[in-house]
Amino acid sequence: MVTNDSLLSRLLPGLLVAAAIFAAWWLFIRAGDHPSVPNQAPGLLDAPSSVGPMLLQASQLGPTYDQSAQDTRATTSVEIRKGQSPAATKIIAHTWKAGARAGWSQVHGSITVLSRAELFTGSDLNAVSAGFERQMIHTYHGKPATAPGPLPGQHGWLLQGTTVSQIYSTLYTARRQVAVYGWQHGDVLAIVVVTGLPRDGVLQAATTLANAQDQNIGFVTRG
């Protein structure tokens, strides 16, 4: 005859397994919907910002791109002055208000995008824009490029180059094509940087995205 203690010792492992399964099921139900990709960490565009709406937005990049929390942030006062001439530094000191950038990368592709905007209180910004252009030439070994279509803004400059940055080579091939377009829209300086493989057509992508961002800037400044 089986004693109560013996019966309990036989049933206990099964009861523990059943309890664990029930707990896991309950947590799953309480969690609700489970997207196939992790939720993006909050970044600059999730908080109120005078410059954030001037950047490219998620709806313009589409669902095939993920936003980088690391590359989506406000511009610091040190960054805005880096590599600038004394004349440009003076303009920045007196008229720069705020800046921001947003980074993106294809989930199942090779393109990365950086969208940047800097807001000033004046429109005499040629010296500052020239400083940005010099930085891009140095960073990407850039050379003037011919636009494949209409480009927005005033005093624009279009560069094509390459990068061997470790930021990209950890994910993609070490040598990548780069297209950079910088322009002025009133009291805003904007830059779009697109990197990719030869098949990606980075010049065309940069042209298309620059026009999209310029529409955002126009909408914000008119509002």
PLM region spans:
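Short, low-complexity patches enriched in S/T/P/G
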Residues: 1-11
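Hydrophobic membrane-insertion alpha-helices, especially the h-region
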Residues: 12-30
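A short, solvent-exposed beta-edge/loop patch
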Residues: 60-61, 145-223
